[in-house]
């Protein structure tokens, strides 16, 4: 989520893996909000062919102690997979997480299928 240098962008990103297809979930829109106090959108991206963002979602003065929310718009992604319901079970996946030390590495991946999801604090 945070990058202090361009070379760190790949290492410090959220990413999304489609556990139904066994592939990176390319093309999913992801928004990030700060939710410490008033909820405010900070950034938005579309995941690339590797299921990753090409840019840091949080960096510089935006990356500070507080609570954040990632919103993955998975409904549009699953609507485009043949033989799945036209109305997806999951439309948006929201992950709320806290940053207690902005000097540490924060990586929040999403593993998602049409019916379930999981996340963890990655390395």
Q: What residue spans do the PLM features occupy?
A:
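Single conserved hydrophobic/aromatic residue that forms the stacking wall/gate
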Residues: 1-10
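Beta-strand-dominated extracellular/periplasmic modules and repeats
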Residues: 11-96, 100, 107-109
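Compositionally biased low-complexity segments at domain edges in trafficked proteins
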Residues: 102-123
């Amino acid at each position: 989520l945070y990058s202090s240098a361009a070379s760190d962008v790949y290492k410090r990103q959220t990413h999304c893996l489609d556990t139904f297809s066994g592939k990176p979930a390319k093309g999913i829109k992801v928004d990030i909000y700060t939710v410490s106090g008033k909820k405010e959108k900070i950034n938005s991206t579309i995941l690339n062919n590797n299921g990753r963002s090409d840019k840091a979602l949080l960096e510089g003065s935006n990356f500070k102690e507080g609570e954040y929310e990632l919103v993955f718009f998975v409904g549009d992604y699953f609507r485009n997979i043949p033989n799945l319901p036209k109305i997806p079970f999951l439309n948006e996946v929201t992950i709320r997480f806290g940053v207690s030390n902005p000097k540490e590495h924060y990586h929040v991946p999403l593993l998602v299928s049409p019916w379930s999801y999981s996340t963890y604090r990655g390395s």
